[in-house]
Amino acid sequence: MPLLDSFTVDHTRMEAPAVRVAKTMHTPSGDAITVFDLRFCVPNKEVMPEKGIHTLEHLFAGFMRDHLNGNGVEIIDISPMGCRTGFYMSLIGTPEETRVADAWKAAMADVLKVKEQNQIPELNVYQCGTYHMHSLEEAQEIARHILDRDVRVNSNEELALPKETLKELHI
C-alpha cells in the first residue's frame, strides 16, 4: 500500500491550531489544487467531540467559502479528519497559509454568531446522514478554542519524519 503524504509528518511535533499545506498537485489542464491540513487539536492530546465536529462541518464549509473564495481560490471540499483533530480542505489555487489562517479565524467568529441550532445548514433528514447528531454548543466551544489560541503555520520541513524512522516503522 502506498505511503500517504499525511503519514510522513511527525504528529508528535504538530502544533495546533495550525495550517499546513498537506499536498499540492496540478490537474491535466494545469490548475493547481492544494490540500490544507487545518489542525484544530494537538494530535494524541486533544480531540473534538463528535457532535461538535459534525455541526462544525455543516457551518465551516459555508463560512470558509465566504472568507476564502475569490482571487484565484475556490474551495472544493472541507472534510473532518477521522481522528477528529482537524479538517482537510481541498481547493483550486495556492493561497498563502496566512490567508487561510485569517479566513479560518473569520469563519470561527461566524460560528460564534449562530444563535440557534435550527440555523445550522442542511440540518434535516434529507440532507444529513446523521441529522440528530449535532451540538451548536460544542461547535461554538471548538470555535472559541481556535480564537483563544490563534492559528499558527505548521511547516512540512520541520515535521518531516526522517527516513530512518519510516524504515523502523516498516513503511
From Swiss-Prot:
Gene3D superfamilies in UniProt: S-ribosylhomocysteinase (LuxS)
Residues annotated as transmembrane: none
UniProt remark on cofactor binding: Binds 1 Fe cation per subunit.
Keyword Metal-binding: yes
Top EC class for this record: lyase
Domain of life: Bacteria
Pfam family, one: LuxS
Residues annotated as binding Fe cation: H54, H58, C128
Keyword Iron: yes
Enzymatic reactions: S-(5-deoxy-D-ribos-5-yl)-L-homocysteine = (S)-4,5-dihydroxypentane-2,3-dione + L-homocysteine
The enzyme's E.C. designation: 4.4.1.21
Reported cofactor(s): Fe cation
GO terms of biological process kind: quorum sensing
A molecular-function term among this protein's GO annotations: S-ribosylhomocysteine lyase activity
InterPro entries xref list: LuxS_sf, Metalloenz_LuxS/M16, S-ribosylhomocysteinase
Segment forming the signal sequence: none
Keywords: Autoinducer synthesis, Iron, Lyase, Metal-binding, Quorum sensing
Family: Belongs to the LuxS family.
Function: Involved in the synthesis of autoinducer 2 (AI-2) which is secreted by bacteria and is used to communicate both the cell density and the metabolic potential of the environment. The regulation of gene expression in response to changes in cell density is called quorum sensing. Catalyzes the transformation of S-ribosylhomocysteine (RHC) to homocysteine (HC) and 4,5-dihydroxy-2,3-pentadione (DPD).
Assembly, per entry: Homodimer.
Family matches, as HAMAP family: LuxS
Protein name: S-ribosylhomocysteine lyase
Protein encoded by which gene: luxS
